[in-house]
Amino acid sequence: MLPKFTIIVATTALMGLGTVASAESCLEVTLTGTQGGPPVFQGQAGSGTLVTYGTQENKCRDVLLQFDTGRGTTQQLSKIGVPAGKVTAVFFTHIHSDHSEGLADLMQLRWHFNSGGPKVDVVCHQDAKSGAGHTMSCEKFAAHIGDALIHSGEMAQRLAENPKRLPGGPADLLNVSTFGPSQAPAVVWEKGDVTVSAISSRHVAGHASYRVDTPAGSVVIGGDAGNDAAAPPRDTSTSSQVELLAKDADILVHSVIHPVMGPLGTTGFPPPIYYRQSTATDLGSLAARAGVDNLMYTHLIPPLGAPRQGPYPLPAPLTADDYVGSAREGGFEGNVVVGADLAKLRLTAE
């Protein structure tokens, strides 16, 4: 695929690939949190990706889209100068706590200081019933994000000191929009030049993956998607739906598990959980087949430098080279970003 965009890569170490001339529009992708799963390691934030689009003069921040809100999302946004009141919309790949628990904090802060609005669009899959009989509900999650503070009395106290705040708490600031299951990309949100499409993908009931298209480029947020087959035998661990969504995308952001965590290793990591993730090697293959230019690994299992993934010990801590090597083994020759918190890519329209 011929290069259409100039890429700036930055990480917490402020690594760069050069400078570019000012362009009319730009798209920026920032990994707000890269912790894989519920464990914590060295202060990494929970899973989340900020996608912003706009003019270079406005730092690509005319539209700000947050995909998943793991723990610490609000603090991470503050580090890059994004106030809670500036987020345009929030999208959930699925309602697991490591991807969603930061919404209450984000919206409580917004309720304190921006209770007059505007409301925040929350976009997610409609209620989905699992094979085990339980229902995953983004709508109920959003409706009840302030319940603990309501029942503790804090909401009443805050309203007494400022009756202009919305009486229902932070949930009153949410405009929830859901979509149904789809095996083909379907538009779920639009604003100006920005279009967001979604497709159903396998992980837990109601899991979805997203694609953002703008004049400055495109990015796919795979979430925790894995293959429709729950375990081998299968050709790959990756999602055919994500591969369809990622065709010719400029950037693919995807959660990743390293093969060292597999059942042939010594970590003792549960095979059913391993098999529902996409491996670093297979994601490299998917990115190559789809014609993706940039592959951003996030939600790393295990984290870089970690001696263990939760209670599961590793034979040795992994480095970025271990993840990049797996992508190359899968046949991907493009740019690989092994996610650290606040790593970013910027696309600028030529």
Where do the model's predicted regions map?
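Bacterial N-terminal signal peptides
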Residues: T6-L17
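Cap/insert and terminal regions of metallo-dependent hydrolase folds
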Residues: A205, A216-S218, G226-A340
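Conserved CoA-thioester-binding segment of acyl-CoA-metabolizing enzymes
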Residues: G222
